Amino acid sequence: MAPPSRHCLLLISTLGVFALNCFTKGQKNSTLIFTRENTIRNCSCSADIRDCDYSLANLMCNCKTVLPLAVERTSYNGHLTIWFTDTSALGHLLNFTLVQDLKLSLCSTNTLPTEYLAICGLKRLRINMEAKHPFPEQSLLIHSGGDSDSREKPMWLHKGWQPCMYISFLDMALFNRDSALKSYSIENVTSIANNFPDFSYFRTFPMPSNKSYVVTFIY
């Protein structure tokens, strides 16, 4: 059999590059954020990265360093993974931020305080605490409402703030326990600041009292 001509090889090579580009464009990148030494690394990853493997993340993902005070409140419609060693930056990253699919991975053996995060629109939560407990990754479905659900329609709290009709309160002390992830929800909650006076961040993020909320506690 005669070897393929140079023209055929060039055509095959071109088709291969085209197919690779189409495959890459078809992939949806996920966001990975990790905190180290008072800095935050915000990464866009085309593939899953092994939890807490900082070197691999820097190698395989497109990452940039962000100073904590420069972090802007945003929303995440896709997958968001956060690696953390303590809770110092989590409130700034997550409180009243719209996150639909969240994974939190503890990358240290630190004992975490009883501190609540308030997350908007959370549909699925995954947690990994293997650095502290030999416990498999856990997953919890919060709610599965679609865009057609009237409660999902955006309600803007303030310029630059995120729509927040579903609110999940996440107790960070759950990472200290080797027990199953649990939650319960309360529907049709009005005057949310009055019903939960111990949550001081409602003074920073005032919630309209004429709206109805679905509140979920995760512990």
From Swiss-Prot:
It is found in: Vesicle; Secreted, Extracellular exosome. GO terms for cellular component: extracellular exosome; migrasome. Keywords: Glycoprotein, Secreted, Signal. Detected in the kidney and in the endothelium of large blood vessels (at protein level). One of its GO terms (biological process) is mitocytosis. Glycans are attached at N29, N42, N95, N188, N210. It holds the Pfam family ECPIP. Its main location: other. It comes from the Eukaryota. GO terms for molecular function: identical protein binding. Residues 1-19 form the signal peptide. InterPro entries: ECPIP. Likely to be involved with PKD1 in the detection, sequestration and exocytosis of senescent mitochondria. Belongs to the EPCIP family. Homooligomer. Interacts with PKD1 (via the PKD repeats in the N-terminal extracellular region); the interaction is not dependent on N-glycosylation of either protein. This is Exosomal polycystin-1-interacting protein. The lineage of its organism: Eukaryota, Metazoa, Chordata, Craniata, Vertebrata.
